[in-house]
Amino acid sequence: MTMAPRRRIRSRLAPRALLAAVAASLAFAAGAQQDARLPDLGSSANALISPEEAKEYGAAMLHQMRALDMVVDDPLTDDYINDLGFRLAAKSDRPKAHFAFFVVKDGEINAFAAPGGYIAVNSGLIIITRSESELAGVIAHEIGHITQNHLERAFEESKKDAPLMALVLLGAIVAGASGAGGDAPIAVLTGGQGLLAQKSINFTRHDEIEADRVGIQTLAKAGFDPNAMAAFFEHLEDVTSADAGGIQTPSLLQDHPVTTERISDAKARAGALVSAQKLRTVTSLDKDQWEKITAPMRFVQDPSALIAKPVGADSLSDYALIRERVRVLADNAPKEVLYYASSLKSEPGFDTPATRYGYALALTRSGRGAQAIEQLQPLQKLQGDNLILNLAMADARLQAGQRGAALALYSALNAGSPRNHGVALAYANALVAQGDKAQATQAADLLRPMLDNADEPEIYSAYGRASEKAGDSVRAQEAFADASYYSGRPFDAMEQLKRMLKRSDLDYYARARIQARINELTPLVMELHKRRISTDDNPDGEQQPDG
């Protein structure tokens, strides 16, 4: 269920395989093995570096994954996963620590934490969960590794070897993406694996259990079902059992078992919390109770194993809708149209409001806006004020050529949810598409307030296009440079900014603003150049920033 990278990959190793190596290099083994083998939640390592350095490493990883189209860069999805993550982080032992959450386009059931509090959740994991509490349990576990300083303890002896190893492996990704010599990525990767063999670092069994314990407490404090973590472990045991005709354990995770003791301990701790706090609980569903609404993944042996229902959430909850949204955005839209159409026709119980929304989204992305409108109209009657549904309707109307109705709906949504990135981005793009200078100015005005706290390249690209059509070429070029930086092309961003300084039409304030941005990016870009980590087509470092 993965989309091809935007840039052609000429290396023998695909970026996703190399990214898997990065995740594997940073993953922590789960201690003694017993009879229950489940995918480990894939915690990653941090080194003994400053918090700011850690954030830079984590941000560089995210930017490079974006450059290779490995991230679900969608404002609604970003808002949801970050709202969920920060709701948990706020109730953790370190509520003021830096965290950032994002979704990876990968059908593997996995999640990992990277330096600087960056936590990634694979699309495959989101799809396989049955409730928001189960998804929250995965994230809470990763937060637990960070808040309990497992990252620092695990690397106390190896100092900075592991994060540098991660950067070396990211360099292999870059080599594969940029078309550098065919054997270059393999050489980098082989060398990295050798270093890892010498500096093998794992989470201890105690660390894993402690992350579970802290995660369960965080779940309860944040108002989620503390039983969800153990329930998810058991669910994975069911669906990853080859003997049961389920999903094969992903190769990346085969060596990361979850012990029976760990499952039992999670159950016991959750039970104690429920008794003490009288929290709501949600019981796991047996297989014959599940609805077949999970998209097929590449490691499925029997499609009947992929059956799940949003337990404890109504069928039009944000969780249920975003899960379908992730399924569609992480895959090929025409393929998803066929999946939904076939399942709606042949699978009893598949037809739910959330799956109808997913079908409509896939139709719109496939250029069938009129059909998408037909799917969405009954849903709007169920929840007429649902922002996710209404935004989907606006997108469908725009695609179907109903521009007036689409713009009116975008405007109403923006008035009701000002500064919502998903609404503003869609509305701005629709305005710019009109080609009118006044509407382009309106689009730029919509997006400008979001630039102060946004790192989504789509926001900057859209603002750049709007500013360009509005006649403000300086702001447009600044925005395009920032879009390049956040897309994993830092050298390109620096070159754009330097070229801007040569313009004769810059006023004092514009020149000062551009120079300040160059000064801000220079140390970051120099560090990436030093490590040869960049997705720019710059294998020889010819665009080294002025020092």
Give the location of each predicted region.
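Extracytoplasmic and endomembrane cell-envelope/extracellular-matrix remodeling and assembly machinery
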Residues: 33, 41-48, 59, 71, ...
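Short pre-active-site segment immediately N-terminal to the catalytic Zn-binding motif
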Residues: 123-137, 201-206
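Membrane-active amphipathic alpha-helices enriched in small hydrophobic residues
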Residues: 163-178, 187-196
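Hydrophobic or amphipathic, alpha-helical segments that drive membrane association/targeting
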Residues: 2-13, 18-112, 241, 322, ...
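Active-site recognition of the HExxH zinc-binding catalytic motif
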Residues: 121, 137-145, 149, 211
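Catalytic Zn2+-binding segment of zinc metalloproteases
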Residues: 133, 143-160, 178
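Acidic/histidine metal-binding catalytic segments
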Residues: 77, 97, 155-166, 184-187, ...
